[in-house]
Amino acid sequence: MAQIIDLVPWDECSAHLYASPAVLLPLERVRHPLAGVKHQLYHPALPSLRRMDMDTVKGCLSDEHCQSSTYFSKDDFNKAHFTLLGVPNKPLQCLDFTATGQKLCHKYRGGKMIPIAPGINRVDWPCFTRAIEDWSKFVSRSEEFKLPCANKRVEGFSGYAVRYLKPEVTQNWRYCLNQNPSLDRYGQKPLPFDSLNAFRRFGSHYSRINYLTPWH
């Protein structure tokens, strides 16, 4: 949005001999409380974690913080839409160009391949995945494997030391350290912001900050 300002005001009786210059000045955007305009889960312009952190460091109030306010109006939230991506119903046209693509086309036309997963336009959508059936078939087809020996106190996986939930008191302390980044059942935990800044501090608390002093 912009506002038009006329720089040359004219009288109603005066004769216009030249064009009046105009300047477009941007208007200040109005922030709305997020609770007053957002009534659904989807946010069309979700603020980034960096933007929220910057507003928190600046000490913005709730009517200026991007976590609790937005420039969008209620109509923008009601008209917002999104598209869920799915597997396309039609194969790519470039599959006939390469030998691998021709082989896949022949297998699919001959009925030797599993049919393509349903796309967005299918009636039975949403069917994101058949994970339960696939997992049961995978487990039933897999062979038996030997479990590790239970008498072994310390086990290592991919360079990580593991331990039992109830360790003995005499066990070595180094296995109590947490790896960084660490993992949980949902995946990798967020990395702390100061984990890479260990022993990397500009200057000292007890001396002058040298990196802010001009060298000339």
UniProtKB/Swiss-Prot annotation:
Per UniProt, subcellular location reads as: Cytoplasm, Cytoskeleton, Flagellum axoneme
InterPro entries in the cross-refs: SPMIP8 (IPR034584)
| Keywords carried by this UniProt record | Cell projection, Cilium, Cytoplasm, Cytoskeleton, Flagellum
GO CC annotations, alphabetized: axonemal A tubule inner sheath; sperm flagellum
Q: Does the keyword Disulfide bond apply?
A: no
Where the protein is mainly located, per its record?
cytoplasm
Q: What outcome is recorded for mutants in which this gene has been deleted?
A: Deficient mice are viable and have normal fertility.
Source taxon at top rank: Eukaryota
| GO BP terms | flagellated sperm motility
Tissues in which the UniProt entry reports expression = Expressed in testis.
Subunit structure, interactors included: Microtubule inner protein component of sperm flagellar doublet microtubules.
Q: What function does this protein fulfil?
A: Microtubule inner protein (MIP) part of the dynein-decorated doublet microtubules (DMTs) in flagellum axoneme. May serve to reinforce and thus stabilize the microtubule structure in the sperm flagella.
- The name on file for this protein is Sperm microtubule inner protein 8
Taxonomic placement:
Eukaryota, Metazoa, Chordata, Craniata, Vertebrata
